[in-house]
Design a protein with these regions (language model features):
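Extended, hydrophilic extramembrane loops/domains of integral membrane proteins
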Residues: 157-197
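Solvent-exposed beta-hairpin/edge-strand motifs
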Residues: 78-103
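Mixed-charge, low-complexity intrinsically disordered segments
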Residues: 41-49, 102-149
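Intrinsically disordered, low-complexity Pro/Gly/Ser/Thr-rich segments with frequent PxxP/GP/PP motifs
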Residues: 98-116, 148-174
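Asparagine-centered strand-capping/turn motif at beta-strand->loop junctions
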Residues: 50, 65-72, 80-82
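Hydrophobic residues positioned within well-ordered beta-strands of beta-sheet architectures
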Residues: 59-61, 76-78, 167-169, 181
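Hydrophobic, helix-forming membrane-interacting segments
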Residues: 1-28
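Low-complexity, acidic Ser/Thr/Pro/Gly-rich terminal tails and inter-domain linkers that flank the onset
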Residues: 19-54, 83-91
């Protein structure tokens, strides 16, 4: 009996050590349709816009990232990626139950700052009639938009055991395309997996 208890205790400790080597983070996604632009003879023209720009199909996409491990995770960089047939239009992120929104990683914020700077240079070149400068800065703006419209990178300072981070994005997709959004996190000791909530 004593030998069985000792073996059981050792097995429990070994299992806990193996389990705690990696922190399992799971995520699930819900896409709620907001609107579809259409034109037909019965209802006429319906146009969905975001920021004054027309879109074909607009979704509100929520992604929940849950720490299902036995320990807290610090300094986590989480990247939200949009499927190639879509575009991230606007975004917000927070740890549920916390009043403060998450910020972008320093690198991602630098990309936003570079985009804003390129936009300002483009507008100056446009106002001054500098066609070569306008073409250069317009190319830089378009490249930044393409990059920033497919992903967002967030800095999560601490994700405690059992806590959930929620990422909310307005996303646009072409007619008939299935919405797709994914999470990535490159950190030693952390494993991110998609898991259906039900």
């Amino acid at each position: 009996l004593i030998i069985g208890a000792v073996i059981g205790a050792i097995g429990t400790v070994v299992a806990a050590l193996i389990r705690n080597r990696r922190v399992p983070l799971t995520y699930h996604v819900r896409h709620d349709p907001v609107g579809i632009s259409a034109s037909d003879s019965v209802h006429g023209n319906v146009e969905v816009t975001i920021g004054g720009r027309p879109v074909q199909t607009l979704y509100m996409s929520n992604v929940w990232l849950v720490n299902r491990g036995w320990r807290d995770v610090e300094n986590l960089d989480v990247t939200v990626l949009c499927a190639e047939n879509g575009r991230l239009a606007s975004a917000s992120a927070c740890i549920e139950g916390e009043p403060i929104a998450l910020t972008h990683t320093d690198e991602h914020q630098g990309e936003w700052d570079s985009y804003k700077e390129a936009w300002e240079h483009r507008e100056c070149a446009k106002a001054s009639g500098d066609q070569a400068g306008l073409q250069h800065w317009d190319d830089a703006v378009q490249a930044a938009i393409k990059n920033l419209s497919t992903r967002r990178c967030y800095a999560v300072s601490v994700l405690n055991r059992g806590q959930t981070t929620r990422f909310t994005h307005m996303m646009e997709f072409a007619h008939g395309a299935d919405p797709g959004i994914f999470l990535s996190c490159q950190k030693a000791g952390v494993r991110v997996q998609y898991k259906d909530p039900y």
